[in-house]
Amino acid sequence: MKKQLIIGTRSSPLALWQAEFTKAELSRHFPELDITLKLVKTTGDVLLDSPLSKIGDMGLFTKDIEKHLIAKEIDLAVHSLKDVPTSTPEGLIITSFTEREDTRDVIISKGGAKLADLPLNAKVATSSLRRMSQLKSLRPDFEICDIRGNLNTRFKKFDEGEFDAMMLAYAGVFRLNFSDRISEILPHEIMLPAVGQGALGIETRVDDEQTREIVRILNHSNTEYCCKAERALLRHLQGGCQIPIGAYASFKNGTLKLLAFVGSVDGTVGINNEITRSGLTSPDQAEEAGIALAEELLKQGADKILSEIRKTR
């Protein structure tokens, strides 16, 4: 058994929360372990003057940490799973999917107004094409404004009065104790989350069996089934932060239900579908369900939507 572990993480407040949470959970199970954090600045932390969708680079928040993992300078990397590309570098693997927080998105607004009550032509801040597409389909009048930076930075920009509202993931807002700022939690019926939203992905080297065995204690089986289904769907659609794709899977008593959405950036075209599979006994079967739903979306015309978006990116 190893005596020491080094966790690689970004230095944002939310990333540090996630790394400290992982450290505390591992220490609870393995009190003899000496666990330290190594902070890594990523491309996504540096390039803050462009929308994520325009940068055109997969793994903006992960690949720099993965370089340290491959070089054996750290033993594991802790990521927001929604930031992790669906294909990991050779020699690396997502070993654990931690139990998921609430996957929904939230509205933070002036005066606590709900989405339906925001004024005509309201300025709504989000850096996500997925949110933009679904928002514009609900309210074509909204002016969508790009916003980058960590959660604290976004709240500062919002409080300075630049926007009428902004959209964030509930999980991050809750984890950093901003829950009292939430105006509305949006149901999946109107806003499907990002693939993997609310879960942490703990990445290790494939050949580091000792670390993998230690980290596997944090894996949450239901979350693994759900996230592998969602990630398989996204992989099959060849999507990322440049494509408006939302998905949400639930898994109970061997039955997986997966909802998915593909839309145009302007919200004028959107395709929704779902799949239910029963009797699942392995995460591989959940991935098969994700691929099957992706195929259905492509048959419905998702390929045309995605092709048009890629022409402009």
UniProtKB/Swiss-Prot annotation:
Which transformation does this protein catalyse, written as a reaction? 4 porphobilinogen + H2O = hydroxymethylbilane + 4 NH4(+)
* Cross-referenced InterPro entries: HemC, Porphobilin_deaminase_cofac_BS, Porphobilin_deaminase_N, Porphobilinogen_deaminase_C, Porphobilinogen_deaminase_C_sf
Q: Which CDD domains match?
A: PBP2_EcHMBS_like (cd13646)
- GO terms for biological process, alphabetical: chlorophyll biosynthetic process; protoporphyrinogen IX biosynthetic process
- The EC number on file is 2.5.1.61
Claim: Metal-binding is one of the keywords in the record: no
Top enzyme category: transferase
In the UniProt record, which is one GO cellular component term?
cytoplasm
Pathway listed for it is: Porphyrin-containing compound metabolism; protoporphyrin-IX biosynthesis; coproporphyrinogen-III from 5-aminolevulinate: step 2/4; Porphyrin-containing compound metabolism; chlorophyll biosynthesis
**Stated family:** Belongs to the HMBS family.
| Subunit record text | Monomer.
| Protein name, per record | Porphobilinogen deaminase
**UniProt source species:** Chlorobium limicola (strain DSM 245 / NBRC 103803 / 6330)
